[in-house]
Amino acid sequence: ERIAGVLLVGYAVASLLAAALSVAMLASGANLRSIVAFLLGGLDGASWPRVIAAAAPILAATLALAARGRPLAAFLLGDEGAMHLGIDVRRERGIAIALASLATAAAVALAGLVGFVGLVVPHLVRLAVGPDPRAVLPLSALGGALLLLLADSAARTAGLPVGVITALIGAPLLLTLLRRARAG
């Protein structure tokens, strides 16, 4: 648990600093703009054919994860608790990781690397509705979509990649959530 906290703090700080560095790079040269735009993500290059192509694996993975609600909920009991309920922990964990990776790969192919949406939103949803993945997964998807739309609107207004906005929102929120979790 402590190692995970250290890793998440490191990710938050690194992403915030990378966003600041990327803004400086964007201002300095046109050749770097396309690389940095992908690294920080955005919806400006999205088209209906690309959205439909990405939607298929995302929807398939999401529905498959939703169908695995019982094993995912059993993980809340820890590995031993899940095993006592008859869950093949290694198999189910592998399936969950593969499905999450499929959805993530499709989303990154569409929008680039947009940080913090998948870290912060599920934590906030979990605080609001509890840990049951049958509620957390769909609400996180809706909350993530809403955050991305709001961040994209702000990014377009400011002329920045959406990843800069999500880092500016997500890093402080993640650090606050981690500090609260550590304190209590």
Ranges and model annotations:
Residues E1-G184:
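Alpha-helical transmembrane segments in inner-membrane proteins
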